[in-house]
């Protein structure tokens, strides 16, 4: 059998409630861990290799949901030639848990990097947070403060050595059937907890506990430490990741049907927790 390998780019979606985040961690269930398990069960990647070759484009924390994320994996070229993409997807999907969907797969070059994307799109369902009040038209003004290129230290859990400069391409209300359910934020890349800390700042402004001037100052003066808190992960969705040669296809259609706002008892859980 030939030792030649083919590198594949795949896309997945999942509900995050049952997972301790996307990346493999010891002794807990993760999305990446489930994917590796399935590929090993199928015999498509080695069970003995210490470092698996399956990587994901964007990390997500425990409880965060994903509409479209991506990743890469290397498999035998002989295997890839012997199976159609449709059968490949079905084989993987049949062994995955019901809350992970394997969406598509294609061949890419070995220099193709899933972590270098044109942009990532996140949406946060603000109405899920306890005591949320829709502030009306002023929400657009508040969200626009987060657009542009700036040091996002005050809106992230900054990891050592991580560049805090981020570019936010757009930040706007998320409206479904005339109802403002939250906001959408688009950027090239995000820092850890950046979207959830942005969500909590918006929530605090809506409650009147902080002012837009305080938020603007936190953006303009990253050297002065400010902590507005972090919103719960339950209402965060990685809506999509787009690459230059792989836009989000039309088949992953816009979701225009949403349940009513969550009941207060559901919304209350972990709302005001800080990290």
Question: Each PLM stretch: what is its role?
Answer:
Residues 2-275:
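Structured-RNA-binding interfaces characteristic of tRNA pseudouridine synthases
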């Amino acid at each position: 059998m030939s030792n030649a390998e083919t590198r594949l780019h795949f896309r997945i979606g999942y509900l995050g409630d049952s997972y301790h985040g996307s990346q493999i961690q010891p002794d807990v269930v993760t999305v990446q861990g489930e994917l590796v398990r399935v590929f090993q069960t199928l015999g498509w990647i080695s069970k003995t290799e210490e470092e698996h070759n399956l990587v994901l484009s964007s990390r997500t924390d425990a409880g965060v949901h994903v509409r479209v994320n991506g990743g890469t994996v290397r498999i035998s070229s002989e295997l890839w030639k012997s199976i159609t993409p449709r059968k490949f997807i079905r084989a993987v999907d049949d062994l995955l848990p019901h809350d992970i969907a394997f969406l598509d797969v294609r061949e890419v070059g070995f220099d193709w990097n899933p972590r270098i994307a044109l942009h990532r799109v996140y949406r946060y369902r603000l109405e899920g947070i306890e005591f949320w009040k829709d502030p009306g038209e002023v929400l657009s003004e508040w969200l626009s403060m987060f657009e542009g290129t700036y040091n996002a230290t005050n809106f992230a859990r900054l990891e050592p050595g991580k560049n805090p400069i981020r570019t936010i391409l757009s930040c706007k209300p998320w409206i479904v059937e005339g109802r403002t359910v939250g906001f959408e934020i688009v950027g090239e890349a995000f820092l850890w907890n950046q979207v959830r800390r942005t969500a909590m700042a918006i929530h605090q402004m809506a409650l009147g506990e902080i002012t837009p001037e305080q938020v603007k100052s936190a953006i303009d003066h990253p050297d002065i430490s400010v902590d507005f808190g972090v919103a719960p992960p339950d209402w965060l969705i990685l809506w999509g990741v787009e690459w230059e040669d792989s836009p989000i296809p039309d088949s992953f259609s816009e979701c225009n049907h949403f349940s009513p706002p969550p009941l207060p008892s559901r919304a209350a859980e972990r709302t005001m927790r800080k990290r």
